Amino acid sequence: MKNIKLIEVPSEIGAGTRGASLGVEAIKIAALDFMSNFFVHFPSEKIEVENKILFEPIQSPYAKRMQGVLTMYDRVSKAVCDSMKSHFFPVVISGDHSTAGGTIAGIKMAKPKSKLGVIWIDAHADLHTPYTTPSGNMHGMPLAASIAEDNKESKVHELDEKTAKQWDQLKSLGKIHQKVLPEDVVFISLRDFE
């Protein structure tokens, strides 16, 4: 475990409710309560977040704060990729889980020829897209972005050109369109799609 690198991402722009950004610090405080030196022992990188856009008008009701999520995917993916190329095992601790797509992208960027598998431990599949989402919250879409799925055959929304373009950018982050194949995803504790 000596090669672990912590990547802290106190972001909450993909969630529908506020407070997820406090999770990283809450985990660190809980570790202190259990007298764990985990957060002191390993090197750490804190990713700059875009939480300020929470105070701006939503541009697309079907992909809320998409530009900020795209920025976060880019930052997280580069941090994960750089960590792996420096022979670290990245442990990403985030607020909302929209950044999971950036984590998966970063692993694929570091190992572009490797086949990835994902164990998705969540109550929700996070396979919605801007075409199918009931909420527009981006935390319901990271796995769909990672497998490059639009699910247009089940669409309930027509996207404007800007939203469709940003969704395509999210899916092809790192110039790799499909980071993981659908058959290489395993779900644990799933009860719903979003």
Regions found by a protein language model. Give the residues of each.
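Conserved alpha-helical scaffold segments that buttress catalytic/binding sites
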Residues: 2-194
